[in-house]
Amino acid sequence: MSQVELQHILWLLLAIGLEIIANIWLKFSDGFRRPVYGVASLAAVLAAFSALGQAVEGIDLAVAYALWGGFGIAATVAAGWIMFGQRLNRKGWAGLGLLLVGMVIIKLA
């Protein structure tokens, strides 16, 4: 799969966006005490996996999954910081940095 088409990249971007939305809605669900957000979160995860399934038709699985997971985590950290005032400590930032370095290495492999 050397030829990655724009449609597969767009599917991957959609999967990443849905993953982020699912995580935010999961936080809003307050441990499923607010079931509308909980159910919406589950639906967003299902949609994210469906979009990822379309993306891997044109992007190698390891690359697509690493990008999906890595960008999803990084953006969720940012959303937690901006929306909920959650902060990472030094170890958390180091882990996020290692994750991003790992994504680059996988992409270059």
Curated annotation (Swiss-Prot):
<comment type="similarity">
    <text>Belongs to the drug/metabolite transporter (DMT) superfamily. Small multidrug resistance (SMR) (TC 2.A.7.1) family. MdtI subfamily.</text>
</comment>
<comment type="function">
    <text>Catalyzes the excretion of spermidine.</text>
</comment>
<dbReference type="Pfam" id="PF00893">
    <property type="entry name" value="Multi_Drug_Res"/>
</dbReference>
<feature type="transmembrane region" description="Helical">
    <location>
        <begin position="36"/>
        <end position="56"/>
    </location>
</feature>
<keyword id="KW-0813">Transport</keyword>
<dbReference type="GO" id="GO:0015220">
    <property type="term" value="F:choline transmembrane transporter activity"/>
</dbReference>
<keyword id="KW-0472">Membrane</keyword>
<dbReference type="InterPro" id="IPR045324">
    <property type="entry name" value="Small_multidrug_res"/>
</dbReference>
<dbReference type="GO" id="GO:0015199">
    <property type="term" value="F:amino-acid betaine transmembrane transporter activity"/>
</dbReference>
<dbReference type="GO" id="GO:0005886">
    <property type="term" value="C:plasma membrane"/>
</dbReference>
<dbReference type="InterPro" id="IPR000390">
    <property type="entry name" value="Small_drug/metabolite_transptr"/>
</dbReference>
<keyword id="KW-1003">Cell membrane</keyword>
<dbReference type="GO" id="GO:0015297">
    <property type="term" value="F:antiporter activity"/>
</dbReference>
<keyword id="KW-0997">Cell inner membrane</keyword>
<keyword id="KW-1133">Transmembrane helix</keyword>
<feature type="transmembrane region" description="Helical">
    <location>
        <begin position="88"/>
        <end position="108"/>
    </location>
</feature>
<keyword id="KW-0812">Transmembrane</keyword>
<dbReference type="GO" id="GO:1903711">
    <property type="term" value="P:spermidine transmembrane transport"/>
</dbReference>
<protein>
    <recommendedName>
        <fullName>Spermidine export protein MdtI</fullName>
    </recommendedName>
</protein>
<comment type="subunit">
    <text>Forms a complex with MdtJ.</text>
</comment>
<feature type="transmembrane region" description="Helical">
    <location>
        <begin position="6"/>
        <end position="26"/>
    </location>
</feature>
<feature type="transmembrane region" description="Helical">
    <location>
        <begin position="64"/>
        <end position="84"/>
    </location>
</feature>
<dbReference type="GO" id="GO:0031460">
    <property type="term" value="P:glycine betaine transport"/>
</dbReference>
